[in-house]
Amino acid sequence: MSDSLERYQEFTGLSIDRPDEGLLRIVIDTPGKLNAVDATKHANLADVWPVVSRDPDTNVVVVHGAGGAFSAGGDMAMIDDIMADPRYRAEVFREARDLVYNMIDCSKPIVSAIEKVAVGAGLATALMADISVCGRSTHIIDGHTKLGVAAGDHAAIIWPLLCGMAKAKYYLMTCEPLTGEEAERIGLVSMAVDDDAVIETAMEVAARLNAGSAQAIQWTKLTLNNWLRMAGPAFDASVALEMLGFAGPDPVEGVAAIREKRAPRF
């Protein structure tokens, strides 16, 4: 590992390399599980961004999933632990806030390449990126209310700004999935492209940013993200209510329904 990447050694479950000078690539990598996010990855997806922000060798970041999928969200073992252990629930509350705020505060522009599926913590990472490139048939869903908890993670801070309150309420309350094509139509993602062109397009966007004025681009991000910072209190409340929900009976039924592949009976 080169000296410029040694700072990232601790972030297991994330494959991190530098395909070009000034460009950092972060790949969520869970073989055979559509890059589901376990406890370690959840922590690392929160903690990696301050390191990126301080990295003098990085001008821009591309984040995507391994094997042609972004992420299927939190794995069931992690959800079981959140429900069972109040101390771990408090830790996940901190990590969920850190993931969002650390991406907002990361000085470097972040480009997400969203392939096949994006759910849960994976969706949070995908949509909190500064520019999101999505496959037309990519499956996007915020499944919190179907699980039996409030839509926390990232939803309250970013969906209303991206697609408007009416669409945000509809998709977050109903858990209706949407395609990348529909996500682009309502403004949830920056652009939708052919499924086989997602990574290539994201890298092209990153190359344009990498060739630009780093200071001007970083200060533009800093300025625009003040809109997100103003939504911080609503976001904090949403994550707190999500965690409160995990202490109740509804997610027990929600998890059982997922495992038994049936509709939940709340």
Language model: regions and residue ranges:
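Conserved CoA-thioester-binding segment of acyl-CoA-metabolizing enzymes
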Residues: 1-66, 101
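Short loop-to-helix capping motifs
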Residues: 30, 55, 85, 212-213, ...
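Glycine- (often His-adjacent) and acidic-residue-rich active-site loop
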Residues: 65-102, 118, 148, 230
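CoA-thioester-processing core
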Residues: 99-105, 113, 119-173, 186, ...
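C-terminal long alpha-helix characteristic of the crotonase
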Residues: 133-138, 189-237, 243, 247-249, ...
